[in-house]
UniProtKB/Swiss-Prot annotation:
Coiled coil: none
InterPro entries with a match to the protein in the record: ArgE/DapE_CS, Bact_exopeptidase_dim_dom, Peptidase_M20, Peptidase_M20_dimer, Peptidase_M20B
Binding site for Zn(2+) 2: D143, E178, H382
Organism (species): Streptococcus pyogenes serotype M49 (strain NZ131)
The reaction(s) this protein catalyses: Release of the N-terminal residue from a tripeptide
GO molecular-function terms, A-Z: metallopeptidase activity; tripeptide aminopeptidase activity; zinc ion binding
Function in brief: Cleaves the N-terminal amino acid of tripeptides.
Protein name: Peptidase T
C-alpha cells in the first residue's frame, strides 16, 4: 500500500452517516455533518500538522492551513471536498474490500445485489486493483469522502516529509454539496488562495472546468374538484394539468436521452390530488443562451396553458442554482495547465470533459477563486452500486502532492 493510512482513513469516514437533507433550513442541513467535522476531521487535521484549523458554524466549513516551507514557491493553492453524501441510505455503511479484483461478479454483502461487469462494464478497468464496495444496503460515500481522505493523506505525507518543498496550502471541508447549497455561504476572505481544486471527480484522470448551468423549477397546478359523477364541464384535474405540462416538454430532452454537451429537463418529483398538484424539475444546460431558452420555454408553456384555461392555474417558480464555471476559469487557465502538467508527469492521461452536473467549485469560481475539479475515484456514485479503487485514490494523492510541489 503506497499510503499506509489512506484506506483506513477512508473506511472510518464512510462509516459516519453524513447524508444531507434537502428539506432542512439549517446549515449544515444535518447535525451529523457538524459532528463529523468537529469530532473526527478537526482533531485529525490538527494531528497531521495543519494550522489555524477552525470551524465556521455559519457556513459549515472546516478550514486549515499548511504554510509553505519554501518562500520561492509563492502560489497559494486550495483543496476542497464535501462532507455530505447523496440522497440514499447512509446508515450503517459496511464497506467490502476486494483485494486484487480478477473480474466477474462482486456479491454485495448478504443482499441480493451484485456488481456485474455486464451491467457495469467500468469494472473491467480495475482488474488487479483493490476495490471498496458497499454491502448492497447503503451507498458507499466515496462521493466525496474519497476526496477528504485523499486531501488528508496528502497533507499527512507532506508534514511527515519536511524535506519536500511545497507552497502555501489551504484545505476546506464543506457541507451540503449534494443538495446544491454547500457553497452558498462560502467565505472567500477565509480562504485566501490563487486558485483551488475540488477533489470531487470520478475515474482516474478526470480534470473538469465546465459544469452545467442549473435551475430548479417548481410548477404548481390548481385544479377544481367536484364529484366525478357530475364532473362533466366542471372538474379541472390538477394531476392531468401536470401531465399535460410535462408532455409539452421535448420528450428527447430528458437525462436518459442526453449526453455530452446536451442539456435537459428532468422531472424529479410529482405529488398532488385533483385539487392541487406540484411538479419539481431541474433544468440543465452548458451554453448560456440555451440555458436561458429552456427557462423561457417553461414560462411560455405555463402562459399558453393558462390562456387556454381562461385563468391562472399553472404557476411557475424558477430559481437559478449555479452557472457553468468555464466562463470564469477560461479567463485564466493556470489551474488547468498546472494540473495537466502534473498529471502527465505522473503518467496519468488528463481526461478533460464537461461535468454533467455541478460542484461547489461552480459557485466558488464565480466568487473569485477559480476552482476546477479533479478525480477522486468514485464510480456508480449515489447508490448501492458505488465503488472506488484504492489505486485511483492513491493516484489522486500523488496529484495533490505534485500540484503543491510544482506551484
Amino acid at each position: 500500500m503506497k499510503y499506509d493510512n489512506l484506506l483506513d482513513r477512508f473506511i472510518k469516514y464512510v462509516k459516519v452517516n453524513t447524508r444531507s437533507d434537502p428539506d432542512s433550513e439549517t446549515t449544515p442541513s444535518t447535525e451529523s455533518q457538524e459532528v463529523f467535522a468537529l469530532t473526527i476531521l478537526k482533531p485529525e487535521m490538527e494531528a497531521i500538522g495543519l494550522q489555524d484549523v477552525h470551524y465556521n458554524p455559519v457556513n459549515g466549513y472546516l478550514i486549515g492551513t499548511l504554510p509553505a516551507n519554501n518562500p520561492t514557491l509563492t502560489r497559494k493553492i486550495g483543496f476542497i471536498a464535501h462532507m455530505d453524501t447523496a440522497d440514499f441510505n447512509a446508515e450503517n455503511v459496511n464497506p467490502q474490500i476486494i483485494d486484487n479484483y480478477q473480474g466477474g461478479d462482486i456479491t454485495l454483502g448478504s443482499s441480493n445485489y451484485k456488481l456485474d461487469p455486464e451491467a457495469f462494464p467500468n469494472l473491467n478497468n480495475y482488474i488487479g486493483q483493490t476495490l471498496i464496495t458497499t454491502d448492497g444496503t447503503t451507498l458507499l460515500g466515496a462521493d466525496d469522502k474519497s476526496g477528504i481522505a485523499e486531501i488528508m493523506t496528502a497533507i499527512e505525507f507532506l508534514t511527515s516529509q519536511p524535506q519536500i518543498e511545497h507552497c502555501d496550502i489551504k484545505v476546506a471541508f464543506g457541507p451540503d454539496e449534494e443538495i446544491g447549497v454547500g457553497a452558498d455561504k462560502f467565505e472567500v476572505a477565509d480562504f485566501e488562495v490563487d486558485f483551488a481544486y475540488t477533489m470531487d471527480g470520478g475515474p482516474l484522470g478526470e480534470l473538469q472546468y465546465e459544469t452545467f448551468s442549473a435551475a430548479a423549477l417548481e410548477v404548481t397546478f390548481l385544479g377544481r374538484n367536484v364529484h366525478p359523477g357530475t364532473a362533466k364541464d366542471q372538474m379541472i384535474n390538477a394531476l392531468q394539468l401536470a401531465i399535460d405540462f410535462h408532455e409539452k416538454l421535448p420528450a428527447k430532452e430528458r437525462p436518459e436521452y442526453t449526453d455530452g454537451y446536451q442539456g435537459f429537463y428532468h422531472l424529479t418529483g410529482l405529488t398532488g390530488t385533483v385539487e392541487e398538484a406540484r411538479a419539481s424539475y431541474i433544468i440543465r444546460d452548458f451554453e448560456e443562451a440555451s440555458f436561458e431558452a429552456r427557462k423561457v420555454k417553461v414560462e411560455n408553456i405555463a402562459q399558453s396553458m393558462n390562456a387556454h384555461l381562461g385563468t391562472k392555474r399553472v404557476l411557475v417558480e424558477l430559481n437559478d442554482q449555479y452557472y457553468n464555471m468555464k466562463k470564469v476559469i477560461e479567463k485564466d487557465m493556470t489551474a488547468i495547465e498546472l494540473a495537466k502538467e502534473v498529471m502527465e508527469e505522473l503518467a496519468i492521461k488528463p481526461v478533460i470533459e464537461p461535468i454533467r452536473g455541478g460542484t461547489d467549485g461552480s459557485k466558488i469560481s464565480f466568487m473569485g477563486i477559480p476552482t476546477p475539479n479533479i478525480f477522486a475515484g468514485g464510480e456508480n456514485m449515489h447508490g448501492r452500486f458505488e465503488f472506488v479503487s484504492l489505486q485511483t485514490m492513491e493516484r489522486a494523492v500523488d496529484v495533490i502532492i505534485g500540484l503543491v510541489c510544482k506551484a
